[in-house]
Amino acid sequence: MARFFIYLAYNGTRYSGWQTQPNAPSVQQTVEEAISTIVRQPVGVVGAGRTDAGVHAHEMVAHADLPCDTPAEAATLTERLNKLLPRDIVIYRMAPVKADAHARFDAISRTYHYYLTEQKDPFMEGLMLKTYRKLDFERMNEAAALLPRYIDFTSFSKLHTDVKTNNCRITEARWMPLAQTGQWVFSITADRFLRNMVRAIVGTLFHVGTGKLSITDFRDIIESQDRSRAGSSAPAHALYLERVVYPSDLFL
C-alpha cells in the first residue's frame, strides 16, 4: 500500500457536503465506495476540508492508502474510477506522497471562490448567485482589504463548533470581474477556514455593497468577535473550493 493525494472536482448540488453523514449522500462516501469496489477492500479517504451541503469544488484534495505501486497503476485506477463515479464527480489525477502526508493537516493554503452574476443566466442556475441588488464592488473590495489585517474571525464562524481556535491567516480577499459582463468572483485565500466562514464574509460584504454597512461597520464587526453582528450567510450553491496548496517536499 502507498499513500496518494487524490485531486478531484465535484458539483455539490446533490450532496450533503464532503464529509460522510448518516442517511445522506456525501462526496467522501461516494468516492470511498467507488475505490473500495474497484480494489476489493475497504479504503478510507481524508479530504483537505469539509465543504458544506451544496458547495462545489474545482479542486479538492484527499489522501488515501492504495494498492498501487507505480504512477501507471494509479493512472489506471483513476480511469476506472471515473467510469464508475457519478457524472458530478471527477478525479483528475493521483500523486504519490510520503507515507505520513495528510491532506488536511499538511495544507499550507486554501482558496475559495464565490461566483456572482448581475444578469439572469439559465445556464448558470445553481452554479452562480443571481443578485437583484445594485452592489458597489469598489466599496466591497475596500472592506475585504481589511480582512488580512486580522486573525480572529469569530464574527464569521458558525456557532457551537468543536474547533480549538478561530484564528486564520488570510492572505488575499477581493472581488474581480469575469470576462462575461456582469459576472464577478470573490477570491479568498487563507491557511485555514472556519465552518461557514466564507459564506458569512460574503453575506456581510453584500451589506457593504448595498450601503447598509459602512467600511467602519465592517471593521467593527470583525473586532467585535460576535457572529450575531455579521450578515447572514450567502447561499451555498455559488461557493467553490478552488485550490489547495502543499509543501513540495511531500511529493515523491
Curated annotation (Swiss-Prot):
Any one GO BP annotation for this protein: tRNA pseudouridine synthesis
GO MF annotation list: RNA binding; tRNA pseudouridine(38-40) synthase activity
Catalytic residue list: 52 (nucleophile)
CDD domains: PseudoU_synth_EcTruA (cd02570)
Enzyme class at the top of the EC tree: isomerase
Binding locations of substrate: 112
tRNA processing found in the keyword field: yes
Keywords linked to the UniProt accession: Isomerase, tRNA processing
Catalytic activity entry: uridine(38/39/40) in tRNA = pseudouridine(38/39/40) in tRNA
Enzyme Commission code: 5.4.99.12
Subunit and interaction comment: Homodimer.
Similarity field: Belongs to the tRNA pseudouridine synthase TruA family.
HAMAP family reported in the protein's UniProt record: TruA
Job description of the protein: Formation of pseudouridine at positions 38, 39 and 40 in the anticodon stem and loop of transfer RNAs.
Protein name: tRNA pseudouridine synthase A
Organism: Porphyromonas gingivalis (strain ATCC 33277 / DSM 20709 / CIP 103683 / JCM 12257 / NCTC 11834 / 2561)
